[in-house]
């Protein structure tokens, strides 16, 4: 027979108004600055699986998002840039942890914040060539998180938030070549900085980079692609957690493949 070991409300209700305020100023035809403030909200809910030591219900998450930025163009529009600074102030942030035998359990942290900046640029120096670069920096931590009477994570970094992210891509497109409408060559390098997998910050993933390559040939409505992902076969973890033992999921290894695309509309 089943034995009830815990009781909780079998229904709940959440509601929240989420305002957003934005101001922008067009400095010229190719330069714009802006600032925004927005209220964020994520409804609470129930953990599908729970024990007497894990709360079946979790509370809503609230945050205020502050951002200032600019979008600028130079060299007659051939160089497009964007930059932004942000700050996020969280209350009762929902934090997901993996518990063996139960799966993912959501708890609420008391107070946390995230601050950083993002930069991006797209440059077209000549016909057919496009260069892209993106960089992001995030410093996210628990300002107050007492998971239990004896377990405190205050001051730790937020799990699953990389400190740095970056991406570089180069694309060259040939038009009307070898009987094709266009032939596109692309190389993209993405980098992910150090990331902590757990709230206690004892399990972490060092920085790594992935290289993807692609060739695409287009004729009429048909496009044939030949591609490779993680071309250098970089070893990294896509997810990890620790209990009595270490559990980790490896990232996808080197892959090569081909695709055929058909566009319905000319």
List where the protein language model places each region.
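Transmembrane beta-strands of outer-membrane beta-barrel proteins
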Residues: 33, 66, 79-83, 131-133, ...
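Membrane-embedded beta-barrel scaffold of Gram-negative outer-membrane proteins
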Residues: 26, 32-38, 57-115, 124, ...
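Transmembrane beta-barrel architecture of outer-membrane proteins
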Residues: 13-19, 37-41, 52, 60-66, ...
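Gram-negative outer-membrane beta-barrel transporters
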Residues: 87-89, 107-198, 259-263
């Amino acid at each position: 027979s089943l034995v009830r070991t815990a009781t909780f409300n079998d229904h709940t209700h959440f509601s929240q108004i989420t305002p957003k305020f934005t101001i922008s100023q067009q400095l010229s035809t190719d330069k714009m600055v802006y600032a925004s403030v927005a209220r964020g909200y994520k409804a609470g809910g129930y953990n599908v699986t729970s024990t007497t030591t894990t709360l079946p219900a979790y509370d809503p998450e609230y945050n205020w998002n502050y951002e200032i930025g600019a979008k600028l163009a130079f060299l007659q529009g051939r160089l497009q840039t964007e930059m932004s600074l942000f700050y996020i102030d969280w209350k009762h942030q929902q934090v997901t942890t993996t518990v063996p035998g139960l799966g993912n359990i959501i708890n609420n942290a008391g107070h946390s914040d995230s601050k950083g900046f993002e930069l991006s640029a797209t440059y077209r120096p000549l016909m057919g060539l496009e260069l892209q670069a993106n960089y992001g920096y995030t410093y996210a931590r628990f300002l107050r998180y007492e998971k239990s009477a004896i377990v405190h994570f205050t001051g730790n970094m937020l799990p699953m938030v990389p400190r740095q992210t970056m991406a570089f891509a180069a694309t060259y497109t040939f038009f009307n070549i070898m009987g094709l409408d266009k032939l596109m060559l692309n190389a993209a390098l993405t980098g992910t900085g150090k990331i902590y997998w757990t709230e206690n910050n004892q399990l972490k993933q060092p920085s790594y980079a992935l290289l993807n390559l692609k060739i695409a040939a287009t004729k009429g409505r048909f496009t044939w692609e030949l591609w490779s992902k993680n071309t250098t076969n970089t070893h990294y973890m896509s997810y990890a957690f620790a209990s009595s033992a270490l559990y980790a999921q490896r990232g996808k290894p080197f892959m090569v493949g081909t695709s055929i695309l058909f566009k319905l509309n000319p």
